[in-house]
Amino acid sequence: MTVFGRVKDLQAIVAALVAEDPKPSVLATLVSVSGSSYRRPGARLLIAADKERTGSISGGCLEEDVMARAARVSATGQADAVVYDTTSENDLVWGVGLGCHGIVRVLLEKLPPRPPWATVLAENFARRRRTALAILHGGDSTQSWGTRLAAPGDCADPDALFLETISPPTALTIFGAGDDAQPLVRLAKELGWYVTIADPRGAFATASRFPMADAIVTGPADHLVARIAPGPDTLAVVMTHHYVHDLPLLRALLDRPLAYLGLLGPRKRADKLCDDLRTAGLTLSAEQRAQLHAPVGLDLGADGPEQVALAIVAEMQAVLTGRNARPLRERDLPIHD
């Protein structure tokens, strides 16, 4: 299983684990799900000795019971695996009707200070590399249960071993540092994405205007894309509001295999940009034109920067997960299938 959406929780958990003076902690990992569940396998909850919590494994209905079990795991040092069955319509096992209609298995393990897998994961996040983890949660000896770096030959076993590949945070590059880019940065950071602001205008692309951005790049419009070198895992949106900037940016971006390319503005403006690119000698294929999300965003009736940012991020999320962005009530399959 490859992990994208849980990276924000993981970033916070890893930061706590590799801190200079880490707190004694127990890690709860959701290792398997049968049926419906609020969270999917790989969701984690870190419980420190002072009961500080980082992350989540449910919508809030399992955490109290897990914390009680974590106290026992912390005291004994022995890992534990617990199964929560929420398939009953009258499920009141923990004092609430969970109503998730699923069976989930959670592993609880006491962690040593700065566990090696967390150190490697922190390094790979910084270097934007993937990390393969193996979580053993079954077998005769609980002494070997827990999280480690995956090794060659590891094979997933739903009854004993959960394997996951953790991708680095989703990379979003916003070409344009206008005021409407600010809520887009904030919303993307709420999702744990790595956000780069790029703009030819150095007076706009500043740390004071974009304190949450991970990187800020300035320079001539026809050099910006080459300097950033966005790859196939990068989301990109062009929103400088200046035709003279958008044209060279779009020309450079259309030649790259991006995960997503969006252009702010009406369809007529996008068509004119594409026509001008053809006039300038760019061979624009039907596939390249179809790759361009213009106008950018979902049709949410957005009005104002915050709503436009929501529409843009929602479309990007749908593209990342291969979904059609239709209402869930119109979906015949289970939500997570």
Predicted regions mapped to residue ranges:
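Adenosine-phosphate binding glycine-rich loop
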Residues: L263-D337
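Short acidic-hydrophobic, aromatic-tinged amphipathic segments that line or gate anion-handling sites
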Residues: A215-P220
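A generic structural signal for alpha->beta connector loops
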Residues: G192, A213-D214, P257-L258, A286-R289
